[in-house]
Swiss-Prot record:
Sequence positions that bind Zn(2+): H118, H122, H128
Highest taxon, organism lineage: Bacteria
PROSITE patterns per UniProt: UPF0054 (PS01306)
SUPFAM superfamilies on file: Metalloproteases ('zincins'), catalytic domain (SSF55486)
Family named by the database record: Belongs to the endoribonuclease YbeY family.
Gene Ontology CC entries for this record: cytoplasm
Protein source organism: Mycobacterium leprae (strain TN)
GO MF term (any one): RNA endonuclease activity
Membrane-spanning intervals of the chain: none
Protein name: Endoribonuclease YbeY
């Protein structure tokens, strides 16, 4: 699986986290592991231009998705067997996302993870134009975000425990006997 990130926004964001959450969603949604995804981070002026050009809406937005191939997403009950493909592009605007994060009382990292999930789901065919679609998509993106955060916490705790174990083994002189 290939996830490429191009940060043209001038904002300092964790590209590692963006790749991590995108990969997590792709795996959870049962997309072929050979799938490719491109992510671009833009400043507000560039995002406003893109928003006007593609959606005919003024001003910047937080996330836009541009599917490359038309296919049924994996992970849905009615989906065909997923195959390798270029999923498409997700365009994020960190500056706009930072404003949303502040308004919601959470971190920029949290907001960008949520927007990445939202963007991937759009690439997989999910939409929120109708109330039922919105309910399904937003519930799924909330669940995926919770699961990704829980996985990150477990990985962090595992790493801290490994560090403690290694320090203890070095202090005990255990490694001197190997």
């Amino acid at each position: 699986m290939s996830v490429e990130v191009s940060n043209e926004s001038g904002f300092d964001v964790s590209e590692v986290e963006l790749v991590s959450v995108a990969r997590f969603v792709i795996i959870k949604m049962d997309v072929n592991p050979a799938a490719e995804l491109s992510m671009v981070l833009l400043d507000t002026a560039a995002m406003a231009d893109l928003h006007m050009r593609w959606m005919d809406l003024p001003g910047p937005t937080d996330v836009m998705s541009f599917p490359m191939d038309e296919f049924e997403p994996g992970g849905r009950p009615d989906a065909a067997e997923p195959g390798p493909s270029m999923l498409g592009d997700i365009v994020l605007c960190p500056e706009f996302a930072a404003q949303q994060a502040a308004a919601e009382g959470h971190s920029l990292g949290h907001e960008l993870a949520l927007l990445t999930i939202h963007g991937v789901l759009h690439l997989l065919g999910y939409d929120h134009g109708e109330p039922d679609e919105e309910k399904e998509m937003f519930a799924l993106q909330g669940r995926l975000l919770e699961e990704w955060v829980a996985e990150q916490v477990r990985a962090y705790q595992h790493d801290r425990q490994n560090e403690k174990d290694c320090r203890l083994l070095y202090k005990s002189g255990y490694f001197g006997y190997l």
